[in-house]
């Protein structure tokens, strides 16, 4: 029963309230901060549970009043109050169920986004640039900071590959649903016959990983330095500031040339490498989970075709939830929350289903 779990959480919260006020625990700052975070996480659930108990008590009190009331006008007023309280109680039950869902420990983290032009040549590279702009605009709307890590540009303004970081609270919780294959259908500027072409770009969204989460031994990496290049491969730097890091055990390769400093490029490349190794470890972990326990909303497979952008129809369709919006222009300007929120809702519904007994 959910009520048993809520009572346990409430007792745990009360215990933590005492602990974080204990001077002996406060002396150990690391332990104290850990307990404070746990206390803050539980506080949201406890406060919602208090609201639920108050609504339940009010509802029962009104039902008792109704059974004793004979005046018709008063009965109508009480019935109206009962109706409102019943609806409020149901809303609180739904909110509590969502709060009790297992938390993704990466949700509050910054993210690395990798976009690669897939099938379609120059047109795919141009679409990759469109996606880069879309995510940049979305980050701006959320007041998140965008930091370019590396880019392999084409002569006509597209990207064979672009890797960038988005820093901001909750960035991963929203953008993790963007991992997968994105398909575009449109008439290229170079197409004289007006024929619609289909191209793809793949997106990978990786949470930023702390040094302590993924440890990389120096003996496991090979570092090469080279001169940074710009559009078409021309040299834009006279020093060997660009860095390529190869992780020997996994074969993963990361390059960074955005900074003028070799040291900064190395730091950035190591961050991306850590994120990729973490993603690899997570994929292996999830592969060991029974299929029926996995969320039905894709949040990680780069090969999964997740969305189609149809320019002639002004349409964007997310295939995971069969949702279509006829607002492609605004979507590409970063107005992507309508689909992201729908994906989050579907993900929550699947997780609640996996939880089994959700009776109060």
Swiss-Prot record:
Methylated by PrmC. Methylation increases the termination efficiency of RF1. Coiled coil: none annotated. GO terms for molecular function: translation release factor activity, codon specific. The keyword Protein biosynthesis applies. It is found in: Cytoplasm. InterPro entries: PCRF, Pep_chain_release_fac_I, Pep_chain_release_fac_I_sf, Prokaryotic/Mito_RF, RF-1. The modification N5-methylglutamine is found at residue 234. GO terms for cellular component: cytoplasm. The keyword DNA repair does not apply. It comes from the Bacteria. Its main location: cytoplasm. Keywords: Cytoplasm, Methylation, Protein biosynthesis. Belongs to the prokaryotic/mitochondrial release factor family. PANTHER family: LD18447P. Peptide chain release factor 1 directs the termination of translation in response to the peptide chain termination codons UAG and UAA. This is Peptide chain release factor 1.
